[in-house]
């Protein structure tokens, strides 16, 4: 495991790796992480070297005879290879590096019993691991000069009755055969895995076998990986489905559309009795046995002609008729050299009979007596068309139907949108006309209160209320508003004036109309906010109210009375008003109530309301300030009750 992979591990994973490697449980922190990673890396490298040193080469030697003490030839060590990157491959190729070579081994008679082998199979360490043995007399130890040292005795014998080697004696700790004794307990299948045939074996089949085995194992692990299954399985299923559709398409495309539906096994007919006399007529009720084959052949030929005509009609040109006249069919049959002309008429009559008796052929005989102006002809009701033609026809029909439906739906949508747009435009025009009327009346009232000559040129009002960008759009609404005012409103006067030699139309407010009836009646509209900020404990009984009237209404004789009536309309009989004063300079209303609670009631009911398109605001005023400003009250104290308020409104 590389240092980069160890660095990418989390603290928990590194702690688990350390415990698995035999290290004590040590907490992983920022200061100890680098040291622990270095220890784990060294430990991993040492394990790899140890595993390489424990790999052995399996060799076997066929014994022709079984002497009590088998002898081995002298081993001449070849030149050692330059690179031992892979211990297993180097060990396996040991017998191929130096041509023909053998091992020289002998058994000590005084220390061990004879080794009974039918086919000697044992593990020998490679030359590079000779330093792993402590003893100098190990049977597998190799000196520095490349030759084996003096062999030692084998501490065990192998039982040939089963597949496992059984120890025959206690091995000394100093003996080098302990590894062989431990390896003898392994399954013989593992030994066969590394057992090579005698002689110079080629490495190419072995490598191919390994590559195949590794590829299969990688494929199995790839398929069994739970992280890959959610991504691989849907794609595999989709691929299989596409393959299935491709196969079905190929089968349908490869199917011959000219296949005749005439099945001789399911044929319906009645044979004529030769003893009965047959009357010569166009109507045939039975068929002779001799004419059956010829009638079937003619029926098949007729189906081919009709199917070809149907293909041309449905797939090429719809103007071509799919029907085939009997005379034309007879001429085509006569022109065919294979047709026997002698029995052509009888075969044709028999074919008509078979067509009538077998409606599953989808061949129709249209008689001329039923359709005036037409000759007798054949027609195929259900032709066998090619798949391409069928698909094209279905798609064309589908899009034709869908297109027609889309056109109908689009037509309805266009009509609906047009109606909605028309209604919206009409509503906007009506609102614009109404707004223009209100603006004109308010402007005329204001000009009438400000100047003595109330006449205004209509073009000036038009330039004021119609912006230059929207003038063309709102001009029709402006003209409608003027027409309605001229026709229905008597408060507005229209006239003509000559200015600079040009006649201009004017509009003015009629001052002769009673001001109380001209739309200046005080009227409450709606509150601007809720009662969350109302004052619970009013400090004084005096109030100062703003925006109940403006400077244009100062000259009205009944202004004070209308304001008092509007206040009584809101508060009713819940409070008593002692005095009401109007300040025409600041356009404010001053009220003095009988108590602080009465002033709080007026403040609660009126403050924050819209009154004649103006927002009312109220402020409490100290009694001393009120008396200093208005030392003299009104002539009569204003104590209003329910009946009095009703009388004022009536």
UniProtKB/Swiss-Prot annotation:
Alphabetized UniProt keyword annotations: Cytoplasm, Cytoskeleton, Developmental protein, Membrane, Nucleus, Transmembrane, Transmembrane helix
Secretion signal span: none
Topology with respect to the bilayer: Multi-pass membrane protein
Region (Disordered): 61-119
Start and end residues of each stretch annotated as Involved in inner nuclear membrane localization: 1-214
Biological processes per GO annotation: negative regulation of BMP signaling pathway; nuclear envelope organization
Record-annotated membrane-spanning stretches: 231-251, 401-421
Subcellular location: Nucleus inner membrane; Cytoplasm; Nucleus, Nucleoplasm; Cytoplasm, Cytoskeleton, Spindle pole
An annotated Gene Ontology molecular function: chromatin DNA binding
Residue ranges of domain LEM in the record: 3-47
Main location: nucleus
InterPro entries membership: INM_ESCRT-Associated, LEM/LEM-like_dom_sf, LEM_dom, Man1_RRM, MAN1_winged_helix_dom, Nucleotide-bd_a/b_plait_sf, RBD_domain_sf
Biased composition (Polar residues): 83-104
Quaternary structure and partners: Interacts with Lam and LamC. Interacts with Mad. Interacts (via N-terminus) with baf.
Protein's name in the database: Inner nuclear membrane protein Man1
Organism: Drosophila melanogaster
